């Protein structure tokens, strides 16, 4: 169809099944809500999950799948607009720039190492699961730096000692220790370049990079501003000690390395996998100006749409990613879980405010992190309180406005973002 794929985003659904009717590499598949509604049993199974959510009243939970899904989307749109309006305009003007800032940061990394923006964007996206952007940006920088600057370093005794601490500590279960030992045996004494030449699996390369990083780099990372500036170091809840960046899985690091090593869009697209969130995140970073409606639904995006203090293990979050028991995914269409419902809510809310869906997402993402801070979420009674408010709403004892006010008053309202409180830049 004449699309220039060198400057193209990637398909947001990645169907791989034999019966698929779309090719996510040859064509650009941009998920739309209609395709989700028309997905048959997949749609019904995912709507069955939301029929139990107390964000809907008992009356709203009853009805056909399409009707209940529509009510759920309308509820989320209402919540997102409420959060959007609760953020001062001066903050909104900055927080809507998150992906433009991410694009600048990733472009700087790409320029430094002579790789494409697409490669650097894929590195960041592949390292994004369960990470905030501050850590994510730091991890992406580490992978690119180590690959380009330390590729010929050999796996020395310092790294071996560090590997023993990382991969064989008391928290590592016996089966994982066995596979870790197998990987480590392949790595002993070798450089990253030697391992690449030996065509070892990306997981093994990931282990080498993580071990080098934890041996020779500081674990501290900086706060980032929405417009792409690095600010002071992130600190822990005590306000003094510096936070430490935590690596995700070796599979994720391996995928990031695959992206660093291969400029071909087919390889990059495949490295991103079938998670709708990771694929949208890549597009938002790679081309923040796109009008195709790409929107990254992560843990905080689900929390904002539902106005709930959710963590990565919450059922609603798992359902969004298609990892929660009872959620439904399809290799034939590439739909995963309830993602399409949230995506549609953000698109509709954005349209009402005349902003891009990714701008609606980053404004409300920042706000919900300030409404439910990590300190607030860490206390079980707070999570229980909010659950109780939605239970009352579900039973018709509170209006939506009353429920939101109760939650807002209890949490103390939206705390200003860390980058807005900072007067430090590098």
Annotated model-derived regions:
Residues 5-426:
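HhH-family (HhH-GPD) DNA N-glycosylase catalytic core used in base-excision repair
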């Amino acid at each position: 169809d004449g699309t220039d794929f060198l400057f193209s985003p990637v398909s947001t659904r990645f169907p791989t099944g034999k019966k698929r009717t779309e090719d996510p590499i040859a064509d650009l598949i941009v998920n739309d809500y209609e395709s989700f509604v028309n997905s048959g049993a997949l749609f019904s199974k995912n709507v069955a999950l939301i029929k139990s959510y107390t964000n809907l009243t008992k009356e709203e939970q009853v009805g056909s799948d399409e009707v209940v899904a529509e009510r759920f989307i309308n509820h989320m749109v209402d919540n997102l607009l409420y959060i959007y309006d609760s953020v001062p305009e001066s903050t909104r003007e900055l927080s809507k720039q998150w992906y433009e800032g991410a694009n600048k940061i990733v472009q700087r990394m790409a320029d430094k190492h002579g790789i494409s923006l697409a490669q650097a964007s894929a590195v960041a996206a592949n390292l994004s699961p369960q990470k905030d952007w501050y850590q994510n940006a730091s991890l992406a920088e580490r992978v690119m730096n180590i690959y380009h600057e330390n590729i010929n370093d050999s796996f020395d005794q310092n790294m071996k000692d560090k590997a023993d601490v990382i991969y064989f500590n008391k928290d590592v279960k016996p089966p994982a220790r066995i596979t870790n030992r197998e990987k480590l045996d392949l790595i002993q004494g070798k450089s990253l370049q030697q391992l690449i030449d030996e065509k070892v699996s990306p997981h093994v390369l990931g282990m080498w990079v993580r071990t080098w990083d934890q041996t020779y780099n500081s674990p501290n990372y900086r706060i980032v501003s929405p417009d792409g500036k690095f600010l002071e170091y992130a600190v822990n809840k005590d306000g003094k000690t510096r936070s430490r960046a935590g690596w995700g899985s070796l599979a994720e690091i391996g995928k990031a390395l695959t992206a660093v090593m291969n400029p071909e869009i087919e390889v990059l697209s495949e490295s991103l996998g079938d998670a709708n969130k990771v694929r949208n995140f890549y597009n938002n970073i790679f081309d923040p100006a796109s009008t195709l409606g790409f929107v990254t639904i992560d843990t905080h995006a689900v929390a904002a749409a539902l106005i709930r203090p959710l963590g990565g293990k919450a059922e609603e979050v798992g359902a969004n990613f298609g990892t929660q028991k009872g959620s439904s995914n399809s290799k034939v269409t590439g739909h995963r879980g309830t993602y399409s419902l949230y995506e549609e809510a953000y698109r509709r809310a954005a349209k009402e405010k005349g902003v891009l869906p990714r701008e609606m997402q980053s404004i409300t993402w920042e706000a919900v992190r300030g409404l439910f801070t990590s300190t607030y979420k860490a206390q079980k009674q707070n999570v229980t309180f909010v659950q109780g408010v939605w239970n009352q709403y579900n039973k018709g004892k509170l209006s939506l406005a009353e429920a939101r006010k109760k939650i807002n008053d209890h949490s103390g309202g939206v705390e200003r973002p860390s980058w807005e409180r900072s007067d430090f830049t590098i």
